[in-house]
């Protein structure tokens, strides 16, 4: 990577260290975000996998809802993986209701591929990638439907598992658990090409 960006990893619960380590390997500057001031001077934000309900409660407790909304409205890039996908969605369906950030016009089926025992790995085809991608699904959700302006990036068994809308990218799997950095590189490209980007 030619450019090194300050990228926040929401550090409330879930796969925090895995994302931090992956970003370091890509010569980026990870910042663990636990309070609103941690968002200052960031070029992008990752909302990692974990337990979406637990992460949401901590977002509220740490008064991060509006700061994350403002971050997105400024045009800064956000990447949500697994639970992060759920939290960024407009609507969720499933047994338990989960409040969300409503930053992407998608409807998500929580734990759509099953619970922990149903975790699996699969080869998928993704837009903008010449070769197949090996994806790790852990209690993975999937996208039931997308609104206008949402670009489908990848599907598995006719279920949408990666998508983008403007400055928000999501995937149902865990890119930080593989050696294939193409989804993270897609996110870094979004940061680099952001018209509002002013690197400090």
UniProtKB/Swiss-Prot annotation:
<feature type="binding site">
    <location>
        <begin position="50"/>
        <end position="52"/>
    </location>
    <ligand>
        <name>L-glutamine</name>
    </ligand>
</feature>
<keyword id="KW-0378">Hydrolase</keyword>
<comment type="similarity">
    <text>Belongs to the glutaminase PdxT/SNO family.</text>
</comment>
<dbReference type="GO" id="GO:0008614">
    <property type="term" value="P:pyridoxine metabolic process"/>
</dbReference>
<feature type="binding site">
    <location>
        <begin position="138"/>
        <end position="139"/>
    </location>
    <ligand>
        <name>L-glutamine</name>
    </ligand>
</feature>
<dbReference type="GO" id="GO:0042823">
    <property type="term" value="P:pyridoxal phosphate biosynthetic process"/>
</dbReference>
<feature type="binding site">
    <location>
        <position position="110"/>
    </location>
    <ligand>
        <name>L-glutamine</name>
    </ligand>
</feature>
<feature type="active site" description="Nucleophile">
    <location>
        <position position="82"/>
    </location>
</feature>
<protein>
    <recommendedName>
        <fullName>Pyridoxal 5'-phosphate synthase subunit PdxT</fullName>
        <ecNumber>4.3.3.6</ecNumber>
        <ecNumber>3.5.1.2</ecNumber>
    </recommendedName>
</protein>
<dbReference type="InterPro" id="IPR002161">
    <property type="entry name" value="PdxT/SNO"/>
</dbReference>
<comment type="pathway">
    <text>Cofactor biosynthesis; pyridoxal 5'-phosphate biosynthesis.</text>
</comment>
<dbReference type="GO" id="GO:0006543">
    <property type="term" value="P:glutamine catabolic process"/>
</dbReference>
<keyword id="KW-0456">Lyase</keyword>
<comment type="function">
    <text>Catalyzes the hydrolysis of glutamine to glutamate and ammonia as part of the biosynthesis of pyridoxal 5'-phosphate. The resulting ammonia molecule is channeled to the active site of PdxS.</text>
</comment>
<dbReference type="InterPro" id="IPR029062">
    <property type="entry name" value="Class_I_gatase-like"/>
</dbReference>
<dbReference type="GO" id="GO:1903600">
    <property type="term" value="C:glutaminase complex"/>
</dbReference>
<dbReference type="GO" id="GO:0004359">
    <property type="term" value="F:glutaminase activity"/>
</dbReference>
<dbReference type="Pfam" id="PF01174">
    <property type="entry name" value="SNO"/>
</dbReference>
<keyword id="KW-0663">Pyridoxal phosphate</keyword>
<keyword id="KW-0315">Glutamine amidotransferase</keyword>
<dbReference type="GO" id="GO:0005829">
    <property type="term" value="C:cytosol"/>
</dbReference>
<feature type="active site" description="Charge relay system">
    <location>
        <position position="174"/>
    </location>
</feature>
<comment type="subunit">
    <text>In the presence of PdxS, forms a dodecamer of heterodimers. Only shows activity in the heterodimer.</text>
</comment>
<dbReference type="InterPro" id="IPR021196">
    <property type="entry name" value="PdxT/SNO_CS"/>
</dbReference>
<dbReference type="GO" id="GO:0036381">
    <property type="term" value="F:pyridoxal 5'-phosphate synthase (glutamine hydrolysing) activity"/>
</dbReference>
<feature type="active site" description="Charge relay system">
    <location>
        <position position="176"/>
    </location>
</feature>
